[in-house]
């Protein structure tokens, strides 16, 4: 039984109810409609405010009982004037028109199953999956940050696709690029008060709102005011919001402090550049999907994974260049070798051209902490100097895989135990302090030349 059929049945029962006079039925019930049914909530539209008063005064419980008898579900009932719904529908239509390209079949492949997991993105993927499986109950809002090309948009659409799969509908989730939201908001702000108010509630029909690249709304105060209203409404109603950005919330400029505070209210989690193993898996998956995996030697893929792993788009760009050159210069099905790859990129700025050394690590860490290498190499127990020294030792261990004794020698004759304890302290701090983890990842990218 669909919504229309259900409401016809409800009205039929009310028309036969002796406690409902013909006048009440004809004046207030006959022209009502059941507008939406979502979870345990029903929204009924009427043509007059008097009708809403009549329903709330004497018919609310009666309708609940009829609905429960017909469906077995105990519904909460709310009422709205039909004219307000029509305004809201007009706004929703405008939103759908401006964002219709966001729902192309292209994004159907952006699923959790197709998301290549690694140390750089595992936590973000797990958090995104958790909110998709239990909207509004786990982390709200979920704020995913990271540089362009690391998989933020993929995760948003993976949430969308998972929710659609669970609920067998495409109407519970709304994906919006932040700049598109800005365009819609600017158009709405140039219209009357009633349209603005309708816009504020137009997203109430969704249970999950996905906003991509929120940094694009920076310094747009009036637009941010509208977004803040919608954001707060979602949080208060336990509806899920997921936001992506190229920066950690506290590093975003152009937003009021209260908005930044709200962004940080739930869970903020970062995406880092893929490590070598993850980059290699991404390459293999994409080439397999294109039926091109057999065209590349293992060594050629390893070269690409090592030198173009700052983000997924650079990996894809390298592959496209090689496939183009293969079409132009090689026989059909001839393997692309390491020599081919090195020749193709002989003039390209490769990430690993500059060798990482203990000296380079010390300099970049010292610069990041605004101290000198001399201070780092001293016996100073000042907090930031100690942390910089420990972090430099940590990078020598994790990026160069140097023995503890050799690292100790690099740092003025520190013994094996001191170095090992320093590395453990950094690892423990990373696991318990997300801001420190954010700093460590930023310094690592500088060291690796990304």
From Swiss-Prot:
Disulfide bond positions: none
The name this protein goes by in its record: Chromosomal replication initiator protein DnaA
A GO MF term: DNA replication origin binding
Family, similarity comment: Belongs to the DnaA family.
Biological source species: Spiroplasma citri
A GO CC annotation given for this chain: cytoplasm
Database matches in SMART domains: AAA (SM00382), Bac_DnaA_C (SM00760)
UniProt subunit comment: Oligomerizes as a right-handed, spiral filament on DNA at oriC.
NCBIfam families xref list: DnaA
Region named Domain III, AAA+ region: 105-326
Region (Domain I, interacts with DnaA modulators): 1-73
Gene (UniProt): dnaA
Domain-level remarks: Domain I is involved in oligomerization and binding regulators, domain II is flexibile and of varying length in different bacteria, domain III forms the AAA+ region, while domain IV binds dsDNA.
Region (Domain II): 73-104
Keyword ATP-binding: yes
Record bears the keyword ATP-binding: yes
Entry superkingdom: Bacteria
Entry function: Plays an essential role in the initiation and regulation of chromosomal replication. ATP-DnaA binds to the origin of replication (oriC) to initiate formation of the DNA replication initiation complex once per cell cycle. Binds the DnaA box (a 9 base pair repeat at the origin) and separates the double-stranded (ds)DNA. Forms a right-handed helical filament on oriC DNA; dsDNA binds to the exterior of the filament while single-stranded (ss)DNA is stabiized in the filament's interior.
């Amino acid at each position: 039984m669909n919504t229309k059929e259900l409401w016809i049945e409800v009205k039929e029962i009310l028309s036969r109810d002796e406690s409902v006079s013909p006048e009440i039925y004809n004046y207030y019930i006959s022209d009502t409609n059941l507008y939406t049914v979502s979870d345990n909530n029903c929204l009924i539209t009427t043509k007059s405010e008097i009708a809403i008063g009549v329903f709330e005064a004497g018919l609310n419980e009666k309708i609940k009982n009829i609905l429960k008898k017909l469906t077995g579900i105990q519904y909460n009932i709310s009422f709205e004037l039909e004219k307000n719904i029509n305004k809201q529908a007009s706004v929703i239509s405008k939103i759908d028109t401006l964002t219709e390209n966001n729902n192309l079949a292209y994004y159907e492949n952006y699923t959790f199953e197709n998301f290549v997991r690694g140390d750089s993105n595992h936590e973000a993927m797990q958090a995104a999956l958790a909110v998709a499986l239990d909207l509004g109950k786990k982390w709200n809002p979920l704020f995913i940050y990271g540089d362009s090309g690391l998989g933020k948009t993929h995760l948003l659409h993976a949430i969308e696709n998972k929710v659609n799969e669970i609920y067998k509908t495409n109407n519970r989730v709304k994906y919006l690029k932040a700049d598109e939201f800005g365009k819609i908001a600017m158009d709405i702000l140039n219209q009357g008060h009633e349209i603005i108010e309708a816009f504020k509630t137009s997203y109430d029909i969704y249970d999950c709102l996905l906003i991509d690249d929120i940094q694009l709304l920076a310094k747009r105060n009036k637009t941010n005011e509208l977004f803040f209203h919608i954001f707060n409404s979602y949080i208060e109603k336990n509806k899920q919001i997921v936001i992506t950005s190229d920066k950690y919330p506290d590093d975003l400029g152009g937003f009021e402090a209260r908005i930044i505070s709200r962004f940080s209210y739930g869970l903020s989690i970062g995406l880092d550049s893929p490590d070598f193993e993850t980059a290699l898996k991404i390459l293999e998956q994409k080439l397999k999907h294109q039926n091109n995996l057999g065209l590349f030697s293992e060594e050629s893929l390893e070269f690409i994974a090592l030198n173009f792993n700052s983000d997924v788009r650079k990996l894809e760009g390298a592959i496209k260049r090689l496939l183009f050159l293969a079409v132009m210069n090689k026989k059909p099905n001839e393997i692309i070798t390491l020599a081919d790859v090195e020749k193709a990129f002989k003039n390209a700025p490769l990430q690993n051209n500059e060798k990482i050394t203990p000296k380079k690590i010390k300099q970049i860490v010292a610069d990041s902490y605004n101290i000198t290498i001399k201070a780092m190499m001293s016996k100073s127990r000042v907090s930031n100097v100690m942390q910089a020294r420990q972090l430099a030792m940590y990078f020598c261990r994790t990026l160069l895989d140097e023995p503890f004794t050799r690292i100790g020698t690099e740092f003025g004759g520190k013994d094996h135990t001191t170095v090992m304890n320093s590395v453990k302290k950094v690892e423990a701090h990373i696991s318990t302090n997300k801001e420190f983890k954010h700093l460590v990842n930023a310094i690592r990218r500088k060291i690796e030349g990304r």
